[in-house]
Amino acid sequence: MTLQKSICVVGASGLVGSNIVKAGLARGYVVHGTLRDHTDPDKAPFLQALPGAASALSLFSADMAEERTFDAALAGVDCVFIACLIPMYAGPSGKPAREMDDEQGYAEIIMPTVNGCLNIMRAADRQGVANVVICSSTSSTNPLPPVAHKNEIDHWSDEAEQCGAKKYTSATKTVMEKAAIKFAAENDMRLSILLPTGMYGPVILPAHMNGNPQAWLRALINGEAGRHEKVPNDSSSMIHLHDLAALFLAAYENPAASGRYFGVYDSWHWQDIYAELQRLLPEMKMPASLEDAPVPATGFDFTRRDSLGVALRDIPTLLRETIDWIKARPDTA
């Protein structure tokens, strides 16, 4: 008899983490999920209602600021997925990150995430967990000067430049990834890092409808103003949440996988995104038209991402599926 493998998802109630939990259960894994409070009535019941959860999901309380709180959740698991490193846009006092100096930005925005990630990795190492997959962001992959097609190996953001521009939230991902890579190398861990941005598709917790693209798409469906008053001269990178979860599992399941992987399907200019949305929602409130020539969309080299072997929905499909799902929700109208 083959024993089921166990995995741990840190940040199980997050947008990404909850989808990894769902995908892991569907693949037959025993899943340990961590939340700050595993009894939270606004979070836990929605995870416990997932297919397969009754027999294969256990929830644990853990806080990334406290390394030892992860010991129980990590005991006996084969891989830990770290999906709790959400962007921080303000410090404990509520002061916006963009108003901080470097000392405060590092102390209150960057280092809590870096130290939290390392706490989880130290706990995993202590429990003998050799496989780690981290959810980061494409914000760590913007080199200067910009390149036409960026890749995960050569192209990094400059954290000093990010801090100089008061982009401490973005710099957090850059600093965290480098620290995690160093720790993994020193402790013989196989580390993969997924780099997503705009995440579309069904959400698992109702609270996730209050932010993310699902919120402004719901507004458009209801005839309200959406995200922009005017089409921005910029692009947006996108992926379906189910495909992103599949990439996370593939990075774990492929023993040759390690390093950074883009977690996006592609990037479209906002002008093209709104054109597609208007095709799907002919009565929607369109933002004011772009007046200037559109800048090129972000270009990617997807060689490494494609090596994981996951088929991804294209942008028209992920937009349509997200809109159809929102329309079917009883609270949309």
How does the language model describe each region?
Residues 3-29:
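N-terminal Rossmann NAD(P)H-binding glycine-rich loop of SDR-like oxidoreductase domains
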Residues 37-115:
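NAD(P)H-binding glycine-rich loop region in Rossmannoid oxidoreductase-like domains
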Residues 160-166, 199, 206, 212-239:
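A conserved pocket-lining segment of Rossmann-fold NAD(P)-dependent short-chain dehydrogenase/reductase
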Residues 162-192:
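Active-site Tyr-X1-5-Lys
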Residues 186-189, 201-216, 250-261:
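Glycine/proline-rich active-site loop of Rossmann-fold NAD(P)-dependent oxidoreductases
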Residues 233-235, 245-294, 322-333:
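Mid/C-terminal beta-alpha module of Rossmann-like enzyme folds, strongest
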